[in-house]
């Protein structure tokens, strides 16, 4: 059986878990000859759906967290460089200009 079934994330599959346990505990020959396979397949399907739902929820939560982090970064940059990062644009242009001048000096030598 699945070892992680006690986790809270699989409470939606509790009926399938109980049905499979009952089938396994009732008569041993049913388990041996695969007569509990319907319950097992239903449980596997339920666990897969629960897992997919958990993954979807985790992706949505991570996107929300990422958006929050990006807002914070933007706020920090606006505080540091001004609105629309005008100061940063000016500094980047000056840096590129100095780099181009140093490259031209190196090529002319």
From Swiss-Prot:
Keywords: Chaperone, Copper, Disulfide bond, Membrane, Metal-binding, Mitochondrion, Mitochondrion inner membrane, Repeat
Positions occupied by motif Cx9C motif 2: 36-46
GO molecular function, one term: metal ion binding
Keyword Metal-binding attached: yes
Disulfide bonds: 13-46, 23-36
InterPro entries given in the database record: Cyt_c_biogenesis_Cmc1-like
Superkingdom field: Eukaryota
GO BP of this protein: mitochondrial cytochrome c oxidase assembly; mitochondrial respiratory chain complex assembly
Family annotation (Pfam families): Cmc1
Subcellular location: Mitochondrion inner membrane; Mitochondrion intermembrane space
Domain CHCH positions: 10-54
Membrane topology: Peripheral membrane protein
Record-level GO cellular component terms: cytoplasm; mitochondrial inner membrane; mitochondrial intermembrane space; mitochondrion; nucleus
Residue ranges of the motif Cx9C motif 1: 13-23
Quaternary structure, from the entry: Interacts with CMC1.
Family, as annotated: Belongs to the CMC family.
Additional observations: Present with 279 molecules/cell in log phase SD medium.
UniProt remark on domains: The twin Cx9C motifs are involved in the recognition by the mitochondrial MIA40-ERV1 disulfide relay system and the subsequent transfer of disulfide bonds by dithiol/disulfide exchange reactions to the newly imported protein.
Purpose of the protein: Required for mitochondrial cytochrome c oxidase (COX) assembly and respiration. May be involved in copper trafficking and distribution to mitochondrial COX and SOD1.
Name this protein carries in UniProt: COX assembly mitochondrial protein 2
Organism encoding this protein: Saccharomyces cerevisiae (strain ATCC 204508 / S288c) (Baker's yeast)
Species classification: Eukaryota, Fungi, Dikarya, Ascomycota, Saccharomycotina
Name of the gene: CMC2
